[in-house]
């Protein structure tokens, strides 16, 4: 029997039992059975003690829940009546009634139960037909499992009994597989179910205020991926369908999901279809439970019984900054700003051509959530969250391979606040100019009605927009990157008729994001904009990436610099490890170098080169980086062999290996964006 609610000493928002860093696992819990894709030496590995394992969370539910509310069922929606003489007419009426009820639940107008009990109603075993119809109304589902979960969370009040949440996720997984049969998940809906389940748990962990021993414990990305993979490998279909053969894609996918969910919590749908912020709704956090109830196939994944499952949204305010203090000071004081690029003869004819790669100017919208505060600098105390030491499963990194082409996980949610997906997002009018390596943002005052349309760049025009703006900013595009949201997000038109995203689809508005990298002044920042059309969003993206690629140095130093630190794969280790006492080796933590381009966003010391030369540099760099990624993967098996003698060493080296891989892969994708933008711009240049 699993522990009762009173026996669980430490529960998070879902009621998931939280383990301290020094908590011990039993021997049976500590063995990880490898899949066919594992090397023989990695068949039995100790699991990570730092995160609540999926196999701990999904315990076999044997105890009944005495406190669960009584949820009414509908006779017309009852599945499995056992009656064989039901006429086709009655069957059609049942289907129609189920569809009607599902539609009313989606609209929030179903009156038989409170909207807070919709999830319990749908998850009730007697209402399978209604649940099926409800999930169909959400189709076509996005190609991202996380975005699918976002759609579900904003469509229904997702606080319910554990087993009811579980049934909803299972049905959603089946529908997702039906919509996307040709992914690396193949027909494995159970595996998708596990991922959705894991994301739900991760959301609770990242965005609640639960503390253990006065410390706020958060799952690391590695721990999240490690434990999700462990649960996947326990599922029979993972091997039967050979899903493990694409595990490198799954690892990439999970890492992107972590980044997105870390920035943007799942919303909590209310009766008025508005999201609740944690700070304003602490009462909603009083109901605790654990996710999960069923046995996942024959793998005996278990869940701890509890009363209800709580999802909630937290005010995920982005850390704000002025991207360049010097630029903004000069901009606000009408002083000239330093040039960021080497001006060439062809620039004069293109620098004022609105709609080109050289210049974009328009009145558009910016997500209020991502809008920076007036004259604010980046919060110094939010540079980085403190890291916690952890012991990780050494099977986690087994088959990671680079993906140099666009994959299923290349969705914009990882770079955006997902305001596009939220009908309650607030937007502000802004005048945007992108030119000469910077983006200028003027936040228009709400009381200004008639705005003079002008794309001029003279001082009089700039002063006019300053006068009608409550705040304005000049951001350097050094190392920035833009993406069009609609390129990568598929939204079901039938999901919510009242949803803004469907209105966006009808009027064909566009959304694009601009990501600014982490630097010494603070963490990564993402701004989200909305344009009149997707075509205009693409033009902004091309212009931003063109200037970012033109002024951003190719980071060769990151890969060519020789360090005396040992990360676990030095030539001496790889060639002479048999004769070395490896226990005397000090393994340092691998981190990318902080280049001048991130220290000084307007630095004059950054080398300015001709456009042709920058294009050539990018072509050579992306080609070379692909070779470096391949070489980094080639040493993986060797590292496993060398460092398997000690868990601590193995963990440190594998963390280093993974960190460097992720850095290289992200750099590869960013430089490809730059390269494409520069190549497109070169088509309009005559030398």
Swiss-Prot record:
Query: So which residues are the signal peptide here?
Result: none
The chain's coiled-coil residues are: none
| Assigned GO CC terms | cellular bud neck; cellular bud tip; cytoplasm; plasma membrane
Pfam families named among the record's database cross-references: PH_GEF_YEL1, Sec7
Q: Where is the PH domain?
A: 412-551
Query: Which parts of this chain are annotated as the region Disordered?
Result: 14-35, 63-97
Q: Which residue windows does the record flag with biased composition (Polar residues)?
A: 14-27
Q: Where is the composition biased (Low complexity)?
A: 73-83
**What does the UniProt entry say about where the protein is found?**
Cytoplasm; Cell membrane; Bud neck; Bud tip
Keywords attached to this Swiss-Prot or TrEMBL record, sorted alphabetically, are: Cell membrane, Cytoplasm, Guanine-nucleotide releasing factor, Membrane, Phosphoprotein
TM annotation in the entry: none
Q: Which SMART domains match?
A: Sec7 (SM00222)
Q: What does this protein do?
A: Guanine nucleotide exchange factor for ARF3 required for localization of ARF3 to the bud neck and tip and involved in actin patch polarization.
Mind telling me what this protein is named? Guanine-nucleotide exchange factor YEL1
Q: Which organism does this sequence originate in?
A: Saccharomyces cerevisiae (strain RM11-1a) (Baker's yeast)
Q: What is the lineage of its organism?
A: Eukaryota, Fungi, Dikarya, Ascomycota, Saccharomycotina
């Amino acid at each position: 029997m699993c522990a009762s609610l009173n026996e669980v000493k430490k529960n998070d928002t879902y009621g998931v039992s939280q383990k301290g860093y020094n908590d011990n696992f039993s021997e049976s819990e500590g063995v990880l059975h490898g899949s066919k894709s594992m090397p023989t030496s990695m068949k039995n590995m100790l699991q990570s003690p730092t995160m609540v394992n999926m196999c701990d969370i999904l315990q076999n539910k044997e105890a009944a829940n005495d406190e669960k509310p009584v949820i009414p069922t509908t006779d017309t929606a009852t599945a499995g009546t056992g009656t064989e003489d039901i006429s086709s007419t009655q069957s059609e009426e049942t289907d129609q009634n189920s569809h009607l009820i599902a539609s009313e639940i989606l609209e929030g107008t179903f009156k038989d139960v409170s909207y807070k009990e919709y999830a319990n109603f749908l998850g009730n075993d007697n209402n399978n037909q209604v649940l099926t119809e409800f999930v169909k109304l959400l189709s076509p589902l996005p190609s991202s499992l996380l975005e699918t979960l976002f759609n579900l969370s904003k469509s229904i009040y997702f606080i319910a009994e554990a087993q009811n949440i579980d049934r909803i996720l299972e049905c959603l997984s089946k529908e997702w597989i039906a919509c996307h049969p040709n992914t690396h998940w193949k027909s494995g809906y159970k595996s998708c179910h596990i991922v959705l389940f894991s994301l739900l748990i991760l959301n609770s962990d990242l965005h609640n205020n639960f503390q253990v021993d006065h410390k706020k414990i958060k799952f690391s990305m590695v721990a999240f991926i490690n434990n999700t993979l462990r649960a996947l490998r326990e599922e029979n279909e993972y091997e039967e369908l050979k899903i493990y053969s694409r595990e490198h894609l799954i690892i990439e996918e999970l890492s992107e999901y972590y980044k997105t969910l870390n920035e943007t919590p799942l919303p909590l749908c209310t009766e008025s279809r508005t999201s609740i912020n944690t700070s304003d709704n602490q009462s909603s956090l009083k109901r605790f439970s654990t996710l999960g109830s069923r046995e996942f196939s024959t793998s005996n994944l278990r869940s701890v019984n509890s009363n209800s499952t709580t999802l909630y949204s937290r005010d995920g305010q982005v850390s704000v900054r002025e991207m360049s203090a010097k630029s903004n000071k000069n901009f606000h004081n009408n002083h000239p700003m330093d040039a960021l690029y080497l001006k060439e003869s062809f620039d004069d004819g293109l620098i004022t051509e609105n709609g080109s790669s050289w210049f974009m100017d328009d009145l558009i919208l910016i997500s209020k959530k991502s809008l920076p505060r007036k004259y604010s600098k980046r919060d110094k105390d939010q540079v980085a969250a403190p890291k916690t030491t952890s012991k990780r499963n050494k099977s986690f990194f087994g088959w990671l391979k680079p993906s140099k082409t666009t994959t299923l996980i290349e969705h914009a949610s990882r770079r955006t606040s997902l305001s596009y997906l939220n009908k309650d997002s607030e937007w502000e009018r802004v005048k945007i100019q992108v030119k000469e390596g910077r983006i200028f943002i003027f936040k228009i005052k709400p009381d200004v009605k008639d705005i003079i349309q002008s794309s001029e760049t003279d001082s009089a025009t700039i002063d006019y927009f300053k006068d009608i703006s409550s705040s304005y900013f000049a951001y350097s595009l050094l190392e920035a990157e833009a993406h069009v949201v609609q390129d990568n997000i598929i939204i079901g038109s039938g999901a919510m008729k009242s949803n803004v995203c469907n209105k966006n689809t009808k009027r064909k508005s566009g959304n694009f994001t601009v990501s600014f990298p982490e630097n010494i002044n603070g963490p990564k920042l993402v701004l989200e904009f909305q344009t009149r059309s997707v075509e205009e969003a693409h033009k902004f993206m091309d212009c931003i990436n063109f200037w970012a690629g033109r002024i951003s140095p190719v980071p060769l130093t990151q890969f060519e610099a020789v360090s005396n630190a040992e990360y676990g794969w030095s030539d001496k280790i790889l060639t002479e490890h048999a004769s070395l006492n490896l226990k005397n080796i000090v393994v340092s933590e691998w981190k990318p170098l902080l280049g001048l381009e991130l220290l000084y966003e307007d630095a004059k010391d950054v080398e300015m080169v001709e456009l042709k030369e920058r294009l050539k540099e990018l072509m050579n760099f992306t080609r070379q980086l692909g070779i470096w990624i391949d070489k980094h993967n080639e040493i993986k098996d060797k590292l496993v062999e060398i460092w398997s003698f000690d868990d601590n060493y193995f963990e440190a080296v594998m963390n280093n290996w993974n960190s460097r891989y992720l850095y290289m892969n992200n750099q590869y994708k960013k430089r490809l964006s730059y390269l494409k933008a520069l190549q497109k711009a070169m088509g309009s240049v005559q030398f």
